[in-house]
Every structure is written in structure tokens, then in C-alpha cells.
């Protein structure tokens, strides 16, 4: 039902190409996952998403628990049927919301007490509840409940979050009993190498079908993220997928892949699209700028997505300036396609034996700009 095969390795880096088999289809790695927090990738329909080449998306346990509630989703036949997406889905456990909504919660060893931001009611999220919600949602991959510490944080605070995350992982494993759903553990440790290494050892000891590196992209410098990945990735089991949470820039993706990471997610492509920004050749173009008013070329002349095939920079500029919703959708479609295309190009380079020359280390003026 769930398996992972490594099909090709780079001879000079840790980069690899693999295939993750799930009940709803295969995921070819390295793979970028668009974020569909509430069961929708903002502004993009499932059909449009499929045409970008996306193979798996991420949804969020915490937000779906609040609205519409896992009972409604379960009654509909599970999250895939509820949202009309018949491809793999990974659900995050809600641990990141412990970090991002810190003023609204109280954390102890039992779990997290939330004040519902919608109606002010008091809610509790524990490892057991988080896993039960994910089993009801019916995702292909569930994430263990974890505590994501903020940045910066003291050594003692991060150590406490690590110990709690490891305890919550044990409890998540104990309650999880859905045979057609894989459970991944999450490594924490902030920017402290010794805590990261210890967390990697502990989480790896549970022999799970996949492991994520969490607690990144919470405000720390990009170089710190790359340092964490270099430290942690070699400690992880070889034969399972490795998932770096919350990463989406081309440089970070390439560095992570060179260190043996397989899966990624980030809200960046759709967030930028909703603000009128397009990703083109690793750069960010603000389509509001007057320079695009009379520019009748495709948005990205090297891209074959529906946006670039059918629409010009001038038209997109017009839509954004006119505050037409279609403009935000078209930019989001392109931005997702941009990241999917980049990860696929890295996979081809690994198979062709030229990844280290083309992508690692990825530089803004490197050949990577011209080969994918």
C-alpha cells in the first residue's frame, strides 16, 4: 500500500531520485507540494493544479478541524472526495500552528489548549486528537504531533520542545491504526546542532515510513536552514522519504536536494501570486509595474504552463492592476508550475549524471538558470 524506492543517486552529492507509492498514486521525488491548508490551494482548482504537474498536496489538520470539521469531511468519503482531488494528500498535524498562533494557546506535556480564533471557544489538541483527526480526514500521509519552537529561542526551551515532540511521537504511533495511511515523524531542535542530531537519532529509532525536518522557516536566516539540513540529513535512514517542511526558494530546494531531501512544501508560490508577483528564472517579477503595460510576450518564454501558453505579460499586468481575481489565479498557476518544473529538472539532472554541475551548489548565475 505504501512504499518508497530510490531509483537513481548522484555520484558526487547525496541527491537521489525516487518514487513514493501511496493508495492514491505515485509521487516522484524530488517533489514540491503546493499547500492546500483548508482543502484548497488558494485560488487554484483541482483541475488547474493537476495540469501544473503537482502530484501531492498538503492540507492542515488544525484548520480543517475548525472548519468544516473532520466529521463533515469523513461523511463526504474523506478529504480526496470532499475536495475533488484524486491524488496523494499529506496532512500536517497542527504543530506549526502551536508556533504561529502562540498567543492563543497554552502548551503542556498533555497537548495544547487553543482559543478558537473563530468563535473564542476553548479547544484542546493532543497527539491522540491530532492523529484521530487525520485518520478521519483520510490523507495518504499523516504527520505526528510536534512542538515547533520559535526563532530565536533559548537552548533550554528548544530542548524542552524536542523532548515533548519525542514523547508526542510515541503517543502518535500508539494511537495510529489506519493501515492505508503512513505516519511520518518530525525532527525538531531549532538551530542547535546537538539537539537536531539527538532528535534525528530518536525519531529514526522508531522505524517510521518517512521522516520530516520541522522547525525551519520560522524566522531564522537561510544559511541556518542549510546548515541544519547538512547536519541532519546524513543521520536519517536511506530507504525512506525525507521531507523538509516549509521550504520553497530555488536555492534552498537545490541545496536540500543535494543533501538527500525528497519532499518539500511552501505557501510561497500562491502567496506571491495573490500579491501580483510571478517567479521567473529564479527572480520575482511584480506584474503591477508599468514596465509590463505594453509587453506582449509570454510571462515566461521557457514555461509551458497554461498561463504562459495563453496569456501575455501585458494582460496579466492589466488583470492585477484591475484587481481581477483571474490574475491572481493565473500567477499562482504559473508559480506552482515554476517550482514543479524546477524539481523535475533536478530529478532529470540526477538521472543524467549532471546534477552536481548544474544545481549543486545552486547560484543565481549558475547553469541551472539555463538548463531547466
Swiss-Prot record:
Which lineage do the record's taxonomy fields give for this organism?
Bacteria, Bacillati, Cyanobacteriota, Cyanophyceae, Synechococcales
Q: Which cofactor does it need?
A: Zn(2+)
Q: Where is this region: RNA binding?
A: 246-252, 270-274
Enzymatic class: transferase
Q: Biological process GO annotation list?
A: queuosine biosynthetic process; tRNA wobble guanine modification; tRNA-guanine transglycosylation
Q: How is the cofactor bound?
A: Binds 1 zinc ion per subunit.
**Which Gene3D superfamilies is this protein grouped with?**
Queuine tRNA-ribosyltransferase-like
Entry-linked Pfam families? TGT
Q: Does the keyword Transferase apply?
A: yes
Functional description taken from the UniProt entry: Catalyzes the base-exchange of a guanine (G) residue with the queuine precursor 7-aminomethyl-7-deazaguanine (PreQ1) at position 34 (anticodon wobble position) in tRNAs with GU(N) anticodons (tRNA-Asp, -Asn, -His and -Tyr). Catalysis occurs through a double-displacement mechanism. The nucleophile active site attacks the C1' of nucleotide 34 to detach the guanine base from the RNA, forming a covalent enzyme-RNA intermediate. The proton acceptor active site deprotonates the incoming PreQ1, allowing a nucleophilic attack on the C1' of the ribose to form the product.
Tell me where on the tree of life, at the top rank, the source sits: Bacteria
EC nos: 2.4.2.29
Q: Give the UniProt keywords, A-Z.
A: Glycosyltransferase, Metal-binding, Queuosine biosynthesis, Transferase, tRNA processing, Zinc
**Name under which the protein is recorded:** Queuine tRNA-ribosyltransferase
For binding substrate, which residues are annotated in this chain's numbering? 92-96, 146, 188, 215
Q: From what organism does this protein derive?
A: Prochlorococcus marinus (strain MIT 9211)
Q: Where is the active site?
A: 92, 265
Amino acid at each position: 500500500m505504501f512504499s518508497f524506492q530510490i531509483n537513481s543517486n548522484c555520484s558526487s552529492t547525496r541527491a537521489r531520485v525516487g518514487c513514493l507509492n501511496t493508495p492514491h498514486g505515485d509521487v516522484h521525488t524530488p517533489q514540491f507540494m503546493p499547500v492546500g491548508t483548508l482543502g484548497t490551494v488558494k485560488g487554484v482548482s483541482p483541475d488547474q493544479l493537476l495540469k501544473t504537474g503537482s502530484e501531492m498536496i498538503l492540507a492542515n489538520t488544525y484548520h480543517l478541524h475548525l472548519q468544516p470539521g473532520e466529521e463533515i469531511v469523513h461523511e463526504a468519503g474523506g478529504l480526496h472526495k470532499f475536495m475533488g482531488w484524486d491524488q496523494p494528500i499529506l496532512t500536517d498535524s497542527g504543530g506549526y500552528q502551536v508556533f504561529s498562533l502562540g498567543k492563543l494557546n497554552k502548551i503542556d506535556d498533555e497537548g495544547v489548549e487553543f482559543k478558537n480564533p473563530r468563535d473564542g471557544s476553548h479547544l484542546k489538541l493532543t497527539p491522540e486528537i491530532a492523529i484521530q483527526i487525520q485518520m478521519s480526514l483520510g490523507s495518504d500521509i499523516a504527520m505526528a504531533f510536534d512542538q515547533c519552537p520559535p526563532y530565536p529561542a533559548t537552548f533550554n526551551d528548544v530542548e524542552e520542545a524536542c523532548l515533548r515532540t519525542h514523547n508526542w511521537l510515541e503517543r502518535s504511533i500508539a494511537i495510529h491504526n489506519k493501515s492505508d495511511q503512513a505516519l511520518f515523524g518530525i525532527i525538531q531542535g531549532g538551530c542547535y546542532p546537538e539537539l537536531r542530531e539527538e532528535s534525528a537519532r530518536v525519531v529514526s529509532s522508531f522505524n517510521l515510513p518517512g521522516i520530516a525536518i520541522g522547525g525551519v522557516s520560522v524566522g531564522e536566516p537561510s544559511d541556518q536552514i542549510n546548515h541544519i539540513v547538512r547536519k541532519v540529513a546524513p543521520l536519517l535512514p536511506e530507504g525512506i522519504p525525507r521531507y523538509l517542511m516549509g521550504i520553497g526558494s530555488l536555492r534552498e530546494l537545490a541545496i536540500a536536494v543535494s543533501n538527500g531531501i525528497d519532499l518539500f512544501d511552501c505557501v510561497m508560490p500562491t502567496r506571491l501570486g495573490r500579491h501580483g508577483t510571478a517567479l521567473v528564472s529564479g527572480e520575482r517579477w511584480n506584474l503591477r509595474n508599468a514596465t509590463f503595460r505594453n509587453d506582449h510576450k509570454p510571462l515566461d518564454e521557457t514555461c509551458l504552463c497554461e498561463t504562459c501558453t495563453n496569456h501575455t505579460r501585458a494582460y496579466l499586468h492589466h488583470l492585477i492592476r484591475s484587481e481581477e481575481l483571474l490574475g491572481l489565479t493565473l500567477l499562482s498557476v504559473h508559480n506552482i508550475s515554476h517550482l514543479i518544473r524546477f524539481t523535475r529538472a533536478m530529478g532529470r539532472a540526477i538521472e543524467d549524471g549532471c546534477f552536481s554541475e548544474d544545481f549543486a551548489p545552486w547560484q543565481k548565475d549558475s547553469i541551472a538558470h539555463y538548463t531547466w
